[in-house]
């Protein structure tokens, strides 16, 4: 009897594995169909990015339903995979771009990818976008149709510091409405408009930030020798006038790689 039970158990496990295999093949086939229709970008998987896990001092959030907000969150957004890919290595990004649907990104050199990664790999901004303070830092545009989807943009003023240089520009956010009614971020980057000279402030230009045809922390003290916990790559600070992200070397946090400061929009009186 015991041997029979074991046989049944093995059989049931085998069936379970077969079912999972079929599901994976079906998903791959479905993605292939969407690429053929030119709609791969809209149909691809979106994700709720746990920003708290990437920034120092953040608590790991509990799993929540797509429409459920975390404590302190005002806006609920999902993130498209074309935004998340910029968190990967330059080599991996190049591979995905060369084999992707967006022709303008194909054939880029590793050097170009690394330059673009500095401008696009700013997913920590999501913490501000989801917060109640979002509208104090970002201006919204009206909705419009493009590539078969309803879209809109959000634009903020930012200063990117890297290698001793400051660049002034816009923090661009592109969104579209998913089939389930959720708001999905498909474009996120810092777009330089000028180099900041000493004694001068930001002079960004606000405009539509959409080049995609079809959607397929305060001053940081020296902590030499300190290492971030696994998965943490930045520190975030926020005040009434600015939201600051500092990216440091994960093995030695005394080495600052770059920083991005999003400035509050001046109130019009």
Swiss-Prot record:
<feature type="compositionally biased region" description="Acidic residues">
    <location>
        <begin position="37"/>
        <end position="51"/>
    </location>
</feature>
<protein>
    <recommendedName>
        <fullName>UPF0329 protein ECU04_1660</fullName>
    </recommendedName>
</protein>
<feature type="compositionally biased region" description="Basic residues">
    <location>
        <begin position="13"/>
        <end position="23"/>
    </location>
</feature>
<comment type="similarity">
    <text>Belongs to the UPF0329 family.</text>
</comment>
<feature type="compositionally biased region" description="Basic and acidic residues">
    <location>
        <begin position="24"/>
        <end position="36"/>
    </location>
</feature>
<dbReference type="InterPro" id="IPR011667">
    <property type="entry name" value="UPF0329"/>
</dbReference>
<feature type="region of interest" description="Disordered">
    <location>
        <begin position="1"/>
        <end position="74"/>
    </location>
</feature>
<feature type="compositionally biased region" description="Basic and acidic residues">
    <location>
        <begin position="1"/>
        <end position="12"/>
    </location>
</feature>
<dbReference type="Pfam" id="PF07753">
    <property type="entry name" value="DUF1609"/>
</dbReference>
